[in-house]
Amino acid sequence: MSTPEITPAAVTFRVPAGTPAGAAMRELGLPNKGPEAIVCVKETEGESAGQLRDLSWVPQQDVEVAAVPANTDEGRGVIRHSCAHVLAQAVQKEFPGTKLGIGPAIDNGFYYDFQVAEPFTPEDLNKLEKTMKKIIKSGQKFERKAYDDVEQARAEYADEPFKTELIADKGNVDPDSDEATEVGAGELTAYSNVNPRTGEVEWYDLCRGPHVPTTRYIPAFALTRSSAAYWRGDQSKAGLQRIYGTAWESKEALAEYQTMMAEAEKRDHRRLGQELDLFSFPDEIGSGFPVFHPDGGIVRLEMEEHSRKRHIASGYSFVNTPHVTKGDLFQKSGHLDFYADGMFPPMQLDGETDDEGNVTKPAQDYYAKPMNCPMHNLIFASRGRSYRELPLRLFEFGTVYRYEKSGVIHGLTRARGFTQDDAHIYCTEDQLEQELTTVLEFIISLLRDYGLDDFYLELSTKDPNKFVGSDEIWERSTEILERVATKSGLELVPDPAGAAFYGPKISVQARDAIGRTWQMSTVQLDFNLPERFNLEYTAPDGSKQRPIMIHRALFGSIERFFGVLLEHYAGAFPAWLAPHQVVGIPVADEFNEYLENFAADLRAQGIRAEVDTSDDRMQKKIRNHTTGKVPFMLLVGGRDVEANAVSFRFLDGTQVNGVPREDALRIISNWIAERRNDQPSSELIQPLVEV
């Protein structure tokens, strides 16, 4: 009988007071090498539950912790942040005089910002990688140091202006910001890279940690690119150079990631959008504001139309609200208190002056709306509501505007102006569980309609330091959300303290064709806005009761979902979404009329069909429409005309010849009507031809 294998991710153990966590870990025989090497521990109880700690950490009292292996998301984050330190050490060694910005771990990698005399070149990155490998091979130790006071830290970083600014801001940075990596809550600390042979400090940096024990715990990394950046993402502040990299628990994991990224580059929706003439981002309009071209407009229309039909069938009422509103509305909703940085500056309207220029009526602030929910609340509150009307489901394709910093804008997936498939549901507490179940089932069903079918759920729960409403209602609603999520049968991943202040949330995460995860849909409970807007309904006993509000957006935004689908399908949309569903390609001009007649029959059934009558040779036409991702290409020559038939050509290069016209019409119309998401091919079409 073989020895059972310990799964590091499942291991919890107690660390006695006065004992380093790493020593307690070693007594258990947990791995310190390979992809499952333990890189840090996580507290599991008390007020510090969820806090990551170095293996060198010595607790003052007995404490239970969980081992964090390298091959977990948290473990990779620690490896990447440690690798960012190695990068910064290498930069200051190779480019003396460089000033340090910040260097956090990010999704799948890390970055570090530097103030340097000249932008980094690809050759510079190659040189830095070599220096980093030497540092990693030397096995430098990461040692934590806590400062007694701010002045001590300020003196130590006197030559680092960006660090001294962070030190001055200690305790006042957004806990979710990248800067919090260095000066978040708790002690002001730094980490030194220590030579294991001499004990000398080779380099140090302001940082909260944690870090891997030594640089040898960074087995695989790569620098990926450099770009311009601004200090703290503010264009009015100093210009910097940012180097991006990635780090993994093994060379195999790094190679797998690099293969996926190479495929992702081919699928980049920004490149495909230009190649397929789907959308653009004109400089004259501004960064983050996409313009959809005719072909992209068709795809978007099909996406919206199918969603609209499904919503109507599911009992949603369509509403429409304006793009701009008075600032008082967002004051009432709390957006100006909690979300002002994400809104565009106000416009001052409705002011009046007399002939001498004296103000007779003060102007009011108007804002482009960042969210639709306040206006939907006004619709609910526009008249008295009865319990018989609940659940009330208000739905809108509502365009919103959010001031995203230029550095985070990314094509369609992170824009400044976008349209949400936004719904707000008002229900009683007794209806909540069934309504959440119905919403989640609807989300999964609709996403599957578009060809996404690999999901897991994430449950975001209360941040004990930032919430409204009673503990009781949070606990009850979180239990309901967890029960609904569990009933779905999908994997449920906890996100402790990840909820917004106004209620717990389930998010649907979808994996695409190359295994990347995208957050698609959110189902968010809200205990805040019904109170702020004094929303009420009349209960059966005649009393006035507060409804529970559910926010939900299935696509996130139309634009983002468009970009995700474009990359998922590598530009080859399913036939029902494709802007050009059928293109006829005559072998010679004499067959144009025959194909035009057949295309007319297809168009009569609502199919987007056309004939390529250009002067290009047939093979060039085939190449053009293959590049254009047309799912059905119909070739016609003399034999086809004689047999009253057409020949199919598919994107994979296969063909089915001599298909009778009636069969071809039936096959194409059924394929599109069924909204099949697979690409047609000879293997799939041949069996559909009647013998």
Swiss-Prot record:
One of the record's GO cellular component terms: cytoplasm
Subcellular location(s) of the protein: Cytoplasm
EC number(s) recorded for this UniProt protein: 6.1.1.3
Cysteines paired by S-S bonds: none
EC category: ligase
Family of this protein: Belongs to the class-II aminoacyl-tRNA synthetase family.
Protein name: Threonine--tRNA ligase
